[in-house]
């Protein structure tokens, strides 16, 4: 039997990152354990997207450490990081608009270098999760609805066989019913496949219900953390992110 694995899958320590002289991250500490869903919430401009992008090396960390699976990846080039089975669905989806759904999914699979049978297994899994995509395999990405594009962005990330999936605002701009489908899919991936997820959301209510733990970021710093349930109960969270906010 191997020793219990107490080391987080992703450990971020004292992370700083800047755009020119704008300091977007000012010493962030955040852990994601294997098998967890962790939500990162915070107002516009807090630095949430920057945190995710810094894991991929763009922008580069100016100080602090990013440790993934025990490996210091703080200064690793972006193309190396994609091969470490970390996948990202960035804010604004960024699918390939001129490519078909099938081609978009293939782009994700190319990162994984899986065998033919692994690819077809992964494709089945994505199309079972998002049957909508199955009906639209030959349609251009750019002509999909917002919800379908989000499904495609997540599907493409899944095709790279990630251990850690980072999602930046997957529910942004989606009707509540479609947003719920996306959150349900994330829950299924976590529960069935043990996928580890770091999710950035302004929809704090949904995100904290979905997540095992959450962090609140204000102005480049983590100001609060706890279980999803604990954070949902906190009056300052309710006031800032739930009551009267985007639900
Ligand atoms: N490419 C860039 N160049 C200069 N400043 C940037 C750039 N990207 C982000 N910033 C600044 O860094 C800060 C953090 O931005 P970031 O996009 O990480 O916030 P966020 O929490 O994801 O916000 P939102 O909820 O609006 O997506 C903001 O002040 C933003 O203006
Ligand atoms: Mg953002």
Predicted regions and their residues:
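Glycine-rich phosphate-binding loops of nucleotide-dependent enzymes
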Residues: 2-247
